[in-house]
Curated annotation (Swiss-Prot):
Residues 8-22 have a biased composition (Basic and acidic residues). Residues 8-34 form a coiled coil. The keyword DNA-binding does not apply. This is Single-pass membrane and coiled-coil domain-containing protein 4 homolog. It is a single-pass membrane protein.
Length: 60
């Protein structure tokens, strides 16, 4: 059993299970929300740099 912060009481099985479920939920949100957003931001930065650094041909 794990000691909770600031007290002598210990975690019950139910509390431990709830904590594990909460951690799994956070990991799932990381995969479904945070990583795609980071990917989109990265692609936007790459596209911006590409468009700003490509050679331009001026017609006479």
């Amino acid at each position: 059993m794990r000691k909770l912060r600031g007290g002598q009481t210990r975690e019950t099985r139910k509390q431990k299970q709830e904590r594990r479920e909460e951690n799994q939920k956070i990991q799932q949100q990381l995969k479904t929300i945070v990583l795609p957003i980071c990917g989109v931001v990265f692609l936007c930065i790459v596209a911006y740099v590409f468009l700003k650094t490509r050679p331009r041909f001026e017609e006479l």
